[in-house]
């Protein structure tokens, strides 16, 4: 009996150890170790953060307007033809990094560099001609209508001089020139109105690239290619407190933005978008700062997913609804005008009055889609999402997509707009996609998941071994119980038992244990 009891106690203890450590302590220790990631100078994480060691796929789609004459003269609904994608390899890195030991932070600028990926772009070459809203002309008119209505008559007089007597707000241009070559804008003039407009543009149009003293140009990528973004960010390194790694705490030396009409739109939330927290729960949003939108934006958990055998959480991102969400009212143009669901204007962000939405007006108000023809929004091709490994916070697979559109419509005192339809006209949309390379997948597997798999086996071995010891103790207990020796009775007693009339028989029978020893 003592051996059986000992086996039961030992087995139970082993099983409890296996369950407690295997399902509780081991995972906790791993999460604690993995979670202690920081941007310590010289560390592998810091090097990866400073420059992503592989190029990101970057794609651009251009919208060609096939009925621009009818749109300009008759106010017809624009008919769009999507041209693309044009592929590029995008390298992302940080520059001018300065570490601050006192508050465990680092300041830096983002820098993107694009290289043409001609093989993927084929059969397109960039020589394709497209008709688009003239970004300088439409941008100038719209910005003035938003901010300085009093200068609209002056702009109306300056348009024929600065834009060579245009008969339309639309422009025919080669795709390459739109993306890199540039749209030339010549301010060489002695006309007072034109000179005044040029003076304003020089001061308030950061999207224009200077060619000479009086000549400028506009392109989508050339001015930004290989140059620092104008916003200097400050984030936590996570050396003193690993839970704060990547947290944005400053922009251009301030602890909040100044682009928008107030809080919470000017608040800095989450990380810089290139590093994420570890030990993520599906019940929490993931916040990050988006440079293109000049705002922090949350990603919402959608479902559990998997990427190349690695368990992941899928999150998606939407623009939001400035017209109904009280927390987004500060993104509205003014007290009386807010864009409907899925749209936000970037005049206060980029200096150009374009409107950001998801491509093809996916997850946006139906009025936007009804205002044009030729779009087919769907989740697979037009949503923003990413898959992230929750224990380490490693992004595994992501697609970030943004469409840029120009507000179109009649603007008082601008002759060229008198017949234009009121619509939001898509201009182009871009996609950044990232897939963690196989060599990094193997690294993640070898340093994390193979350890987890090993521990998973160990915890079951320990638990089942303990259960086996308990089972052995139980078996031994019953074996001992069933194999106890039988004590033979005397012949006299037997005779007494055989004689039911003998009184002493009852007395002896009352003290027998039927052959068992207590």
From Swiss-Prot:
Q: Which domain of life is it from?
A: Eukaryota
Its GO CC terms are: cytoplasm; plasma membrane
Record field: transmembrane: 9-29, 457-477
Mode of membrane association = Multi-pass membrane protein
Q: Does the keyword Thylakoid apply?
A: no
One of the Pfam families matching this protein, by short name: CD36
Its function, per the record, reads: Plays an olfactory role that is not restricted to pheromone sensitivity.
Protein name per the record? Sensory neuron membrane protein 1
Taxonomic lineage: Eukaryota, Metazoa, Ecdysozoa, Arthropoda, Hexapoda
């Amino acid at each position: 009996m003592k051996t059986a009891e000992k086996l039961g106690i030992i087995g139970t203890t082993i099983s409890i150890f296996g369950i407690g450590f295997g399902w509780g302590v081991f995972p906790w220790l791993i999460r604690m170790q993995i979670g202690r990631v920081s941007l310590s100078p010289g560390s592998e994480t810091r090097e990866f953060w400073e420059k992503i060691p592989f190029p990101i796929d970057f794609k651009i789609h251009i919208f060609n307007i096939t009925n621009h004459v009818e749109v300009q003269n008759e106010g017809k609904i624009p008919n769009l033809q999507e041209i693309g994608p044009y592929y590029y390899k995008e390298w992302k890195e940080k520059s001018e990094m300065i570490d601050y030991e006192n508050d465990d932070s680092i300041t830096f600028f983002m820098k993107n560099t694009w290289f043409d990926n001609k093989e993927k772009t084929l059969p397109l070459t960039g020589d394709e001609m497209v008709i688009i809203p003239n970004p300088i002309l439409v941008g100038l008119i719209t910005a003035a209508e938003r901010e300085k209505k009093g200068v609209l008559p002056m702009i109306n007089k300056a348009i024929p001089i600065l834009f060579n007597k245009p008969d339309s707000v639309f422009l025919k241009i080669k795709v390459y020139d739109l993306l890199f070559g540039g749209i030339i804008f010549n301010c060489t003039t002695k006309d007072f109105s034109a000179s005044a407009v040029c003076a304003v543009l020089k001061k308030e149009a950061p999207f224009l690239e200077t060619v000479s003293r009086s000549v400028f140009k506009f392109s989508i990528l050339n001015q930004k290619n290989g140059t620092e973004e104008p916003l200097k960010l400050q984030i936590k390194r996570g050396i003193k407190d690993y839970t704060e790694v990547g947290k944005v705490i400053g922009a251009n030396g301030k602890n909040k933005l100044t682009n928008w009409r107030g809080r919470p739109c000017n608040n800095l939330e989450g990380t810089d978008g290139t590093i994420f927290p570890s030990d993520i729960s599906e019940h929490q949003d993931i916040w990050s700062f988006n440079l293109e939108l000049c705002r922090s934006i949350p990603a919402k958990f959608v479902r559990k997913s998997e990427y190349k055998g690695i368990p992941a959480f899928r999150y998606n991102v939407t623009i939001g609804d400035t017209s109904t969400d009280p927390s987004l009212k500060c993104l509205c143009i003014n007290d009386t005008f807010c864009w409907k669901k899925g749209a936000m204007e970037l005049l206060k962000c980029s200096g150009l009055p374009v409107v950001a939405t998801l491509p093809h007006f996916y997850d946006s108000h139906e009025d936007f889609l009804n205002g044009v023809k030729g779009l087919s929004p769907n989740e697979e091709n037009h949503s923003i999402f990413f898959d992230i490994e929750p224990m380490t916070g490693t992004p595994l697979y992501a697609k970030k997509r943004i469409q840029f559109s120009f507000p179109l419509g009649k603007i008082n005192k601008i002759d060229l707009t008198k017949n234009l339809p009121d619509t939001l006209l898509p201009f182009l949309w871009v996609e950044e996609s990232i897939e963690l390379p196989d060599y990094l997948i193997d690294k993640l597997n070898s340093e994390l998941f193979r350890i987890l798999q090993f521990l998973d086996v160990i915890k079951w071995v320990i638990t089942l071994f303990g259960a086996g010891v308990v089972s052995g103790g139980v078996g031994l207990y019953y074996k001992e119980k069933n194999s106890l020796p039988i004590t033979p009775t005397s012949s006299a007693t037997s005779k007494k038992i055989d004689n039911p009339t003998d009184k002493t028989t009852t007395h002896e029978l009352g003290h027998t244990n039927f052959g068992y020893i207590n």
